[in-house]
């Protein structure tokens, strides 16, 4: 599944303004081997760049739909464009995430979070959002299957305990 063209243009606009982004969410899931439908485009962005990123999105015709740990945008004129979520993380977290060597796009120029970070984000989402449970658990299971040997079982257990709690490992792997 190919990333929509407007996502490439958006990434380039951010690059021109020296605001780094990392592709996350469903498109990162697809990049890491599990192709599935996604109804938005998630980017990780440093909180240090939040004000500039919001101003850039507004200058490109996007309106804020809601703000929390992420800011969701919709284009004010082109309603067929997918919503865009900017997920805000600390400067330190962004620096760690940006060490990923994963790239996507026709010119392989779009930075993507690495598999371990993606799993950590999916596990963290499980902790607080029951309505997301099914989708995120499936993502984790399929990502582990598609990337056998990349993340060890012990490392997955550690990630589960750290980001989703002590029972998450059994839940994710359907262990009674």
Question: Could you tell me what each predicted segment is?
Answer:
Residues 1-176:
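Compositionally biased terminal segments of proteins
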């Amino acid at each position: 599944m190919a990333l929509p063209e407007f996502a490439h243009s958006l990434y380039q606009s951010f690059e021109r303004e020296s605001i780094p982004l990392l592709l996350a969410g469903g498109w990162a899931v697809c990049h890491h081997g599990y192709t599935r439908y996604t109804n938005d485009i998630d980017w990780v962005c440093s909180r240090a760049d939040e004000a500039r990123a919001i101003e850039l999105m507004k200058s490109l015709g996007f309106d804020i739909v809601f703000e929390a740990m992420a800011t969701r945008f919709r284009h004010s004129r082109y309603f067929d464009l997918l919503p865009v979520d900017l997920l805000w993380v600390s400067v330190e977290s962004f620096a760690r995430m940006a060490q990923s060597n994963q790239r996507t796009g026709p010119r392989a120029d779009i930075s993507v979070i690495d598999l371990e970070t993606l799993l950590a984000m999916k596990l963290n989402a499980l902790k607080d959002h029951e309505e997301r449970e099914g989708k995120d658990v499936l993502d984790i299971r399929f990502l582990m299957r598609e990337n056998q040997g990349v993340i060890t079982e012990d490392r997955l257990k550690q990630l589960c305990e750290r980001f989703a709690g002590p029972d998450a490992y059994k839940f994710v792997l359907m262990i009674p």
